[in-house]
């Protein structure tokens, strides 16, 4: 099925250049190699294209010849466009044609082509000669233009396109990093190859009828399970507030927990762990809200002030690897003030685990710095730290087709009284990230119109995945949910850079689904209306639109014009009542405002608070949506079988519906336009077989259901029923009217086809890999080629696809799909080019990621059509249903856009609503077709030709047939594996029922087995298969295999169901022998094993005169030879049965452990029976199990015939029985080993498979050494668990220039020094004296693997650099149990758990753990019997120690526990450890640790254990209670026996380096040389030879490092004996590299073991950090290692406050207006708030200067390694004991203003981390606010320098008072600034990342002195200025403001600083006095002047 083109020859080429021929067909371009030639060129290359089964008529092939150049772009020489219509009819053409140049002239260049066409069905098309009747008058008419051909893009245009793309990437601020990396990484490929090259792609056919699980899969249900949400609140930083008392509240769902309250700090440290448990479905858990809120505690608890809140849903955490956020900072924002910026950060660790998840304990938390907050935020990958505010607008317009029946008590009473439907009062509730908004209530309407907009304010992008729309009924008593729809924000938005867009949706209809409308008082399926599960009933649809507006900048607040009617969580308002409802047309015009009217030309303003606003909208215009079109849903019921026998009493009918159309209760099928009147709702659809328009009187009568028929039993021996549909097939057709948005679903179907081909190909590849057969790499290559070709075809087709009435989401989604598929084609091409045999697994993993992306893109968020519901009626009652997406059956003219099930017979499984998962009520074979009414003619085109419609004028009412084609089905059932146990014995009596069509047959019953080997052939004769004969190969019928457990006294118990597709053999097809396949069994959502079988569907031959018979080429044709003489069953034919080969199975019987009671009796004489392939191997009967549970006869063997293929070999069954009196046997337990591959003798492989593999990979793997190297496979969660435990730097070794100070004295180091150095090493930041590679070069040597002859002689000339010895020895830290690292120590002794009872070993959850009855310890070895003759003794006994009792000394080292589950009501626990083995028990109850969830134990417990009596060690953590019994927190179990006997030597770990004494003294009972000698003796090697710098072991030579001097040049006395021990230790640590004999030995380690509780299996209860040492009692054991916790060192910190300067002046003199402050300093160490100290008050400081000379003295306990202060105090007022709390060593300095009457005013603060504090400035002039920044330098460690003095700034966050003061100063226009305001702005204030401004409010001169308590007692000092060593009183007056005592100072501050003002005032006063005197004397002088002459 392909077009093949061979380019043979080129002639007439100009000049000599590099030529290349390019061929383009349907948008796919392929190129030849570059040929350097002259005028002629021989090409000789072959190319192939797929055609998807569509004809070539109208298609063309474009051929172009270009000149290639290394510098310039390719220059085209000529083009030829060939029509392929003649090729379609001829099948083969040889052409020699001339090319046409750019000016459309015939050029002299000619090309010779050989074209071949392979049609899809082997027949070519027809040639339409009339299409070529026009005579050709010009040579130009030879050219057929190709509309899809485009000229090559010139260089300028390509450069411009890249510039535009780069500009878009830079302009867009949001996007995922992965997308950008992919684009940038593929950019060079785009420059070299503008088109993707593919060749020879043949697309695989897509199966629909029997593809895996059918469409009506009842297993896809929501199953509730147990989840744990763990939240560790570590610390908070940069909390906004002044002298706050913060605590953090964590809320998950409805559960809320709070931390302790810390006083007077903005950077509290908590380290508290909270555990939340839920029993929910995963879907519901994703929607739960995580809310982290910081509060400022007040005097009364309910008066706490909110600082900030962080919200996200748990779905974000589930999307992370392992559902884990580790030590991330959650940014806090105030919902009431969105303009305030970030309010602080809370550092948390978040984990979400389900039952059974692999434990991933986080590293122990430690206080971190705030320097990397912005780079380590609690945000998903790709989300930027700076998130702007955004407004999400949800526009709710109207609803249609709502239910008319109210449920509940009042609805039932109303219907009983009035006998009529009770209309609803609907309203819509929208939920978004904890916020809820509601529309108004529309009373008693089924088609309400709201036209309202709900606005939500949230940060962008929002940390949620869902937007929930819920339609509710405003009932009188309690509101009821009618239906729920969840919009996935990931589907309506994209964060990519190239095709990203903000959340947008609609306007579009949202379909609503829920439960069946019932009149009962209680709806059992009400959860479906709440959105918990898939709805089973169409409840109407809702017209909504969603948009999001992002605010980029900060805008000043403006008065809002909208009315707020609802608020956060419905606290600020209530929804409208009925009396407030507003009907359309009654709203005043002035009030009705469209949403877009509020937008103006100005930038939108940021809302002031997170409030939900409700606004009115204008109705949506009439032409906003697409026009209505008539749709036809056509169906034909071919088969109804597998019907439950309980439905036999009533007739059965069937109904299909889409929306409301098609329901038997609905008389009108026009639900979508029912409210528009009868004229508009009249259906005008063309009849099926008529081209004229339908008249009103010729409308079709809808068939709303099939005729009721009585069911009949199926043929055969099955209990099922079926409907008699042999001759007549009923038809169903439903007309409905919807908006025509079918192009949405067609585009989605195209993506689905690409995904389905990729999925099908990957499944086949995995099957081939499972069988280890050839062809897997070739099939993977073909799959990737199909991916590339399908993606490119979609991109080319998207350019021609038209969209009618698209909205914003449609346009954005079209761009996204084109970009994503284009990118996926390039990624697939990259995988295709890099595909090799050694990286196949990695390629499959990457291809699965592409598949997941394709499936996500294929989901249409705006479905235009509701789903199709198929209902089965029993009488008048609905009993079963199936829901089919309309997308799957939608018709399109283009095949790629057609639904996968459209026009095909599909298998549907009907399930009962609300039934248990896995229950199937019926199976249907149904033909469905959905399309436009104008395309109705095509609905019957895909029906089988032998079906004839009944005579009618329109659509057929039913189809009938007279002639039948008969088939024979041969069901070859070989075996089943892993079947569930159904009997109390832990076994089953399984049999299988095979059902196809209306026939059912049953296999024989095999008793007491979980792996039945039926080896049976079931033959179904005279089988009628519906469907087109030519489509049966691709669409075979479905075969159902039901496995049951046979009960003698009762019905059979269902065990599982599998589905299979038979291989179809038509008469003309050659016969192929079938191969056995695996079909998984499932029981609901639970895996129930697998069936190995194969099925053949053979068409019977009609050529004879007698009855139809099997064709002659079928083998075997006669089945009589397969009949078994005893049972009468047919056995498998030899061609199907696997080829058997004699194998020897050797069994090692070691012993039984932990057997419990059976039927209330103790086990006394057990025996082990092994069954494999019908043969049994029995062990001896233990004479007394209690005294010695080990077997004395260890090895037995048996010869069995097993299949040569390992994947077909049967499982091994292990049965443990007990021999009781009178010959009775009782089954104790059983175990099934499903695969025997791990027990096959190493080195035995199938030579035939090796040859085939070599032949297959010869062309795929490059030759040479590069092809032999294997790439690392993709990591798994198990590999992640094996990664070393990491922790933040603890500073034991220091960094930078202080490194030399950090090298401690070996005499001062202990085990904890080694432990913390190991933590630092595994963090990936080794110190300068430890620069070795962690992957295996820690000792600086390599295993010599040079020339083989040199290796045999033990010589080598390689040189290895020898590093110096580590300053501190380290150990290995595992963050999982040691068993996970070393395969459970089952290298030669395996442990098989025994189960008994129903459920077996494959049960889930609590049921599985309840069936455990003991363990069998042993092993197996399988190898061909032909090789057994060459062995003198059993191979399994090699290296097996003696099986005798032995006594051991076990030392259990308990380091600490992390994240323990709380056991007390206060959220804490009082843990202690209990270690037990049998009756031996040790505990630390007397040394329990109160009120801790992360206790540090440091305990060593010793036990004397004897094997095999006490093989298991139990380590449990209990909670100590004063009253009552202690509670178990969790426990872990360790198999001591396997550890002791393992070749990994797990009894005592190997140290990293050899030391005789000290903290790293050798602690094993044997020296390294003795251990190495013992290994050589066990492996048959000679004694190792020690040389200078090398050790020879066998034929290998290890280079070993010599003892290099330490870095301080100390010359140790190293003896030759110690040197040999160090060399032997080096060889032991690299023992795994010994060829054939090497195995990794356990190093010195600390393992992390998960703790579980028996009542909650699978749920992690914490982690225990520990290790154990095991020593034989006959060897003297070394002394135990001291791991007692380090006691904190008591320090005394002396802080002298000398002076302050530039302190903010907070008080104002009411008389003079002068500002001043009464300064005093307050200080304390965090965690010791009760020891808070204050200086005296410096009153009336007018310059900010203060003089104190005051000493603070603080005593605290300090842990140097952890850098924490240890505080012991009672956690509460009612606590009886003190608990230990740890805080970072931080000193707080605060400057306050003293007030006599009101509360004191806070001026500023400074927090200094004592281990890492900034050095102070030398003088106040150089002290700026920069010293208060994070990471300011230079820095020092006060615990090392011990004494420090300087000036430090105190800062304060700018508040409104500071802003007002600055505004007043600016308005006053002061010319002289104070001294403290002088300087640059960056020295006075700074802005943090949250936008908060901090200002400099003063400077403090202080002196710090740190002493140990012993030193302090030798030189005591007094507090304040007291003795001893008193400080002088400061040089300040007693009263700073006294005009008489201090007149000079008064003069300075009140006269001198204002002398200009005083002079001006004096001058004005003099002038005023002068004027007053003038005016006072003027009248007298005037009168005197006037009257003086008179007197004279």
UniProtKB/Swiss-Prot annotation:
Feature: compositional bias, Polar residues: 559-569
Binding site for Ca(2+) 2: 1464, 1519, 1521, 1527
Cytoplasmic-facing ranges: 1974-1992
Superkingdom to which the source organism belongs: Eukaryota
Bilayer-crossing regions: 1953-1973
Segments for region (Disordered): 554-606, 661-686, 691-710, 1245-1276, 1322-1361, 1862-1885
Positions with biased composition (Basic residues): 572-581, 1869-1878
Membrane topology category: Single-pass membrane protein
Sites where the protein binds Ca(2+) 1: 1464, 1470, 1519, 1521
SMART domains assigned to the protein according to its UniProt record, in alphabetical order: C2, FerB, FerI
C2 domain sequence ranges: 1-97, 214-330, 369-502, 951-1078, 1126-1250, 1430-1549, 1675-1824
Extracellular side: 1-1952
SUPFAM superfamilies in the record: C2 domain (Calcium/lipid-binding domain, CaLB) (SSF49562)
GO MF term set: metal ion binding
Gene3D superfamilies: C2 domain
A Gene Ontology term for the protein's cellular component: membrane
Subcellular location: Membrane
Cofactor entry: Ca(2+)
Sequence positions that bind Ca(2+) 3: 1795, 1798, 1801
Biased composition (Acidic residues): 1247-1257, 1328-1337
Keywords, alphabetical: Calcium, Membrane, Metal-binding, Repeat, Transmembrane, Transmembrane helix
Coiled-coil region(s): none
Protein name (record): Fer-1-like protein 4
